[in-house]
Structures are given as structure tokens and as C-alpha cells.
A protein has these predicted regions:
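Alpha-helical transmembrane segments of multi-pass secondary-active solute transporters
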Residues: 7, 69, 110-113
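Juxtamembrane/transmembrane-helix interface segments of polytopic membrane transporters
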Residues: 22-26, 85-97, 129, 133
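Intracellular helix-loop hinge segments at the cytoplasmic ends of transmembrane helices
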Residues: 54-60
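A late C-terminal transmembrane helix in Major Facilitator Superfamily
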Residues: 63-97
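Multi-pass alpha-helical transporter architecture, strongest
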Residues: 23, 107-146
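A membrane-interface helix-boundary motif in multi-pass transporters
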Residues: 90-118
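Helix-to-loop junctions at the C-terminal end of transmembrane segments
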Residues: 1-3, 92
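C-terminal transmembrane helical hairpin of 12-TM major facilitator-type secondary transporters
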Residues: 4-53
């Protein structure tokens, strides 16, 4: 019930954990169970964040700006969808010089980039929670009040 900012923080931590599992697990310990477990963690993260994010927008933005707020969120998301494949491609090219077969690439750096995004999301989640406590937006309160 409620806990929007907390769910964002938990989702960010889970995203970090998942990508660090992919980045630093030694090859001899990287079994299908580990891989599937990391993907399940990522799935939970990807479920928590939108479930908390979208219902929180009306708590932060006046009703008359709500449509614009959602459009800005989609705009920023689409910028990320456009730029991050380029960034990851550049990172793969820079760290796998001389590797002809893409299935032989080392994906550690891209996973660390994604883990870093999890850290950034965690920091922003903490900042959001602090701001919510100061200004009383109600991000930690349920949307439906009895």
C-alpha cells in the first residue's frame, strides 16, 4: 500500500544487483541457474519501477500539467532508447578490438554501465524520498484512501 519512492529505490537496487551478477560472476560459476536468476531479478526490477513511477506523477504535478509531464517522461525515455544502444555499441567496439565474432565479445563494460545507471537511479530515488518527506507529496502513501 503506497511506498512509491521506496519501490523505485528497491527497483534500482535490484537493477544494480542483476547487472553486477552479469558483470562480475566468474565464468566457472556462471551457470544457467545464475543467468535465469539474474533475469528474474531484472524482471522484478522492471516491474517495480513503472508500477511506482506512473502513479506517482499526479502526486508531483498539477492536474493542468499532467499531460505535459507524461509527455516529457516519454520524451526522456525515448532519448535513452536512442542513445544507449549507440553508447553500448561504442563500449563494445572499444573493449573488444580485434574480436571478429560478436558472440565472443566481453560484455563486462556494458553491464557495468547498466549497473552504474542503477546506482544513479538509487541516488535519484533517495533524493525523491527526501524531497517527499520535506514537501509532503504523498509518494509513500496509497493512491486510494478509504
Amino acid at each position: 500500500k503506497g511506498k512509491g519512492a521506496s519501490m523505485l529505490i528497491i527497483g534500482a537496487v535490484l537493477m544494480f544487483v542483476c547487472h553486477m551478477i552479469f558483470a562480475i560472476t566468474p565464468e566457472q560459476y556462471f551457470t544457467p541457474v545464475v543467468a535465469y536468476g539474474a533475469i528474474v531479478i531484472l524482471g522484478v526490477s522492471f516491474s517495480l519501477v513503472p508500477a511506482a513511477l506512473w502513479p506517482s506523477v499526479p502526486k508531483l504535478v498539477e492536474n493542468r500539467y499532467l499531460g505535459s509531464a507524461y509527455s516529457v517522461i516519454f520524451w526522456i525515455q525515448n532519448i535513452g532508447l536512442m542513445t544507449f544502444p549507440i553508447l553500448i555499441g561504442w563500449a563494445l567496439s572499444a573493449t573488444n578490438q580485434g574480436v571478429a565474432n560478436p558472440t565472443d565479445y566481453n560484455y563486462t563494460v556494458p553491464m557495468l554501465i547498466f549497473a552504474g545507471l542503477g546506482v544513479l537511479a538509487f541516488i535519484f530515488g533517495i533524493m525523491l524520498k527526501i524531497e517527499d518527506k520535506k514537501k509532503g507529496y504523498g509518494l509513500e502513501l496509497p493512491n486510494i484512501k478509504k
